[in-house]
Amino acid sequence: MSFEINWQDLGEDEAVNDSIKSFLNSHLQSISLPSYVSSLQVTDFCLGGIPPNITLREISDPLDEFYNHIEKEELPKDKIPEESDSGCQSADGENGDLLPEVQAESDLQFLVEVDYKGDMRIGVSAELALNYPSPSFMTLPVKLSITDLGIHALCLVAYISKQLFVSFLCDVADPILDARESLIDLGSSAILGKKSLERISLIRSIKIDSEIGEQNNVEGSVLRSVGKLEQFLLEVFRTILKKEAAWPSWINLDFNEDPSGNESSDED
């Protein structure tokens, strides 16, 4: 079974694009930049008009972890059970799950296969710092365009009490993306290379094009720094997506009357 998504409306929604741009910038501000970069900011984000292909693989009851998350959100802070030395949650000295007393009939969980090779675009601005003969001796503006994002993975989508949970589980074999994962473009763009030994990479393919300011005065050391910046961005965006959306983390969308916004939860 396949799904059709009105992706065009999402891609043209400025609020959605601005929200994702703000989300990415908040993460960029929280990371330590390498010495050759003095600033880094997402200046533009467009979801694009090409939707992912989504195939339904299984329908089941939602996982206990999602119910536990909802109950912990609803409990007062002084009532949240502490974790025992073994890592399991306990209440009144006993281990146990925080399952709801009543599970609604409308609660559902879908295991879906997500295949995305769309036209999403991310614009990034940065300043390369030349640290010789002194730190930040000179800075050079750089504009980067991120395109050709490729994802093919299994994903859990759970609906509980007007809340939506989305978590990616593992990569799926893909002839196109598997071929791209073994490539590195040494020209003006970079392709994410080296197959990950982990169960999930999520971002299997990504391309970055760079535009350097004052190109007539560019030195070899600057060009090398641009290449390092491109590779740094590849790892940053892959890490952000894995940290926020790959199991045991998830994206939580609350559609109740008093929504708390987009949240992600880490469950160790």
Swiss-Prot record:
GO cellular component: endoplasmic reticulum membrane; ERMES complex
GO molecular function: lipid binding
Subcellular location: Mitochondrion outer membrane; Endoplasmic reticulum membrane
Region (Disordered): 75-94
Membrane topology reported for the UniProt record: Peripheral membrane protein
UniProt entry keywords in alphabetical sequence: Endoplasmic reticulum, Lipid transport, Lipid-binding, Membrane, Mitochondrion, Mitochondrion outer membrane, Transport
Stretches assigned to coiled coil: none
GO biological-process terms attached to the record: mitochondrial genome maintenance; mitochondrion-endoplasmic reticulum membrane tethering; phospholipid transport; protein insertion into mitochondrial outer membrane
Predominant location category: mitochondrion
InterPro entries, A to Z: Mdm12, MMM1_dom, SMP_LBD
Residues of the SMP-LTD domain: 1-256
Known function: Component of the ERMES/MDM complex, which serves as a molecular tether to connect the endoplasmic reticulum (ER) and mitochondria. Components of this complex are involved in the control of mitochondrial shape and protein biogenesis, and function in nonvesicular lipid trafficking between the ER and mitochondria. MDM12 is required for the interaction of the ER-resident membrane protein MMM1 and the outer mitochondrial membrane-resident beta-barrel protein MDM10.
Quaternary context: Component of the ER-mitochondria encounter structure (ERMES) or MDM complex, composed of MMM1, MDM10, MDM12 and MDM34. A MMM1 homodimer associates with one molecule of MDM12 on each side in a pairwise head-to-tail manner, and the SMP-LTD domains of MMM1 and MDM12 generate a continuous hydrophobic tunnel for phospholipid trafficking.
Domain free text: The SMP-LTD domain is a barrel-like domain that can bind various types of glycerophospholipids in its interior and mediate their transfer between two adjacent bilayers.
PANTHER family cross-referenced by the UniProt entry: MITOCHONDRIAL DISTRIBUTION AND MORPHOLOGY PROTEIN 12 (PTHR28204:SF1)
Homology family: Belongs to the MDM12 family.
Descriptive protein name: Mitochondrial distribution and morphology protein 12
Name of the gene this protein is made from: MDM12
